[in-house]
């Protein structure tokens, strides 16, 4: 079976990210041969962060991507930054027993700090605020998930509130 690759596009998907991005940014296709010390494939969060950190040791860093920076799934998230994982707590504890779980949670927390540190260090023009987040869900499985995580974070001294439907509607300003 042969796979025909899809043509790369420079069109952004319809998203909050696209709607609020600097319209003046447009990156063309790489059409010439280049040499570099470090080539990074992918201009999502991981690729861009790798490039930023690599430039602390070398100036010769090139990033390539089949589309615009941030085009992929990480670029469509609307800008939320919070130390959350979509797996249930017990599943993660099974995957990362003992100290591995604690290290995993610390990595989640450190990742949030890193985002805000980079924004400050490089004076990124954005409206970054550390003001919490709402993680919504519907149904018994989602309620169990949210309850487990809210109890976990509260146990670590975080300010966490489990909201019902009415309180969530009040906080976000809509019932939809």
Region locations from a protein language model:
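Conserved N-terminal glycine-rich FAD pyrophosphate-binding loop of Rossmann-like flavoproteins
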Residues: 67-103
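Residue-level signal for pocket-adjacent positions within structured domains
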Residues: 12, 25, 29, 76, ...
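Extreme N-terminal leader/targeting segments of oxidoreductases
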Residues: 1-38, 56
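Rossmann-like flavin
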Residues: 92-176
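N-terminal Rossmann-like FAD-binding beta1-loop-alpha1 element of flavoenzymes
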Residues: 33-63
């Amino acid at each position: 079976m042969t796979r025909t690759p899809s043509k790369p596009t420079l069109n952004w998907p319809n998203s909050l990210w696209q709607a609020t991005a600097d319209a003046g940014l447009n990156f063309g296709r790489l059409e010439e041969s280049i040499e570099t010390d470090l080539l990074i494939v992918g201009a999502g969060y991981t690729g861009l962060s790798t490039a930023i950190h690599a430039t602390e040791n070398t100036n010769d860093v090139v990033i390539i991507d089949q589309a615009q920076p941030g085009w992929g799934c990480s670029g469509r998230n609307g800008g939320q930054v919070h130390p959350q994982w979509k797996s249930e707590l017990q599943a993660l504890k099974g995957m990362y027993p003992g100290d591995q779980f604690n290290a995993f949670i610390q990595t989640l927390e450190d990742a949030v700090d890193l985002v805000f540190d980079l924004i400050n260090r490089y004076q990124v023009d954005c409206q970054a605020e550390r003001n919490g987040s709402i993680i919504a869900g519907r149904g018994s499985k989602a309620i169990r998930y949210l309850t487990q995580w809210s109890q976990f974070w509260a146990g670590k001294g975080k300010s966490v509130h489990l909201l019902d439907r009415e309180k969530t509607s009040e906080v976000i300003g809509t019932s939809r």
